[in-house]
Design a protein with these regions (language model features):
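Conserved, single-site charged/polar hotspot
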Residues: 1-62
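Trp/Gly-enriched beta-strand/coil motifs that build multi-repeat beta-propeller-like domains
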Residues: 60-312
Length: 312
């Protein structure tokens, strides 16, 4: 036995609710256990467990960070906490975060354009003290770790360090505001996503599809690219997930009654799963995403980012 993954829960309660499917991963292959209800939980009965509300924290594979508007950062799984801005007096709330390519550091950016760097993340520049036409909503790191981009809700893009400017929507009237951005794996392009799921691709970023022509139940809150950059996911405020290109759909919260809005998502290093995270930090794993108790973060979570694959 290598590990045990909880691959489905009923979505009710702490760390995603009661267990409804397990994958036992072993050297000779995988074994699936489908669990219809408490009485039908063969795993629980075999080990004498008194509840079907369980998890396996000893099997740590991957992880993610969540950032809050006050600058605090919580690390889950294999993610490491490299300090944060919670002890500082911020000029404006934190809006986004980005992890360094090594996974040993991260940047935070505020809506006013201030940038804070931790771990092996280098401070390369910011929009501090400059008059912005619209608040900053997104941050994307260059793959070489020596630059980053900021984007504002009006589609304006600001490039620092090795990150080159490939265009923006700053001078275009948008149907809905931009809510996030992602960089291509080469660092020679980026995508912007709007609240209606409209996608704007620049440089070598490929357009794989969008929801800009659809009527969404709730606005998009963030996007995440698939490993290798051949696709991307959007997540909406109600937990709806939309996949494009080679990004695979592993499930969503779109058909559930959520007690809090979904703030964002993070994708596993394999691309075989993802976490959806509410604005109080509660996470819901899908696919091969491990299960973590992340609701200790508390309210005002605004950004989520996953531990990356090691360079090379």
């Amino acid at each position: 036995l290598i590990r045990i993954d909880v691959t489905k829960r009923n979505g009710l309660g702490q760390f995603g609710g009661r267990t409804r499917h397990l994958t036992l991963v072993g050297t000779a292959g995988n074994h699936q256990i489908d669990i219809a209800n408490w009485g039908g939980d063969s795993f629980r009965r075999a080990f004498g467990l008194r509840s079907d509300w369980y998890r396996f924290p000893d099997f740590v594979a991957g992880g993610f960070w969540v950032a809050k508007t006050n600058g605090s950062v919580l690390a889950l799984g294999s993610a490491v906490h490299y300090s944060d801005a919670s002890s500082q007096t911020l000029g404006s709330p934190v809006a986004a975060m980005a992890v360094t390519p090594t996974g040993r550091g991260y940047w935070l950016v505020t809506v006013g354009g201030d940038v804070y760097a931790y771990g092996d993340a280098a401070y390369i520049g910011a929009m501090s003290g400059l008059a912005l036409n619209a608040p900053i909503v997104g941050l994307a790191a260059h793959p070489d770790g020596n630059g980053y981009w900021l984007t504002a809700s009006d589609g304006g893009v600001f490039a620092f360090g090795s990150a080159a400017f490939y265009g923006s929507m700053g001078d275009v009237a948008l149907n809905k505001p931009v809510v996030g951005m992602e960089a291509t794996s080469s660092g020679n392009g980026y995508w912007l996503v709007a609240a209606d799921g409209g996608i704007f691709a620049f440089g070598d970023a490929t357009f794989h599809g969008s929801t800009g022509h659809l009527r969404l139940n709730q606005p998009i809150t963030s996007m995440t690219i698939a490993p290798g950059g051949g696709g991307y996911w959007f997540v909406a405020k109600d937990g709806g997930v939309f996949s494009f290109g080679n990004a695979t759909f592993h499930g969503s919260r779109g058909n559930r009654t959520n007690r809090r809005p979904i703030a964002g998502m993070a994708v596993t290093t394999t691309g075989g799963g993802y976490w959806l995270v509410m604005d109080d930090g509660t996470s819901f794993p899908f696919g091969d995403a491990p299960d973590y108790v992340s609701n200790t973060a508390g309210p005002t979570v605004v950004a989520i980012d996953a531990v990356p694959l090691p360079p090379g």
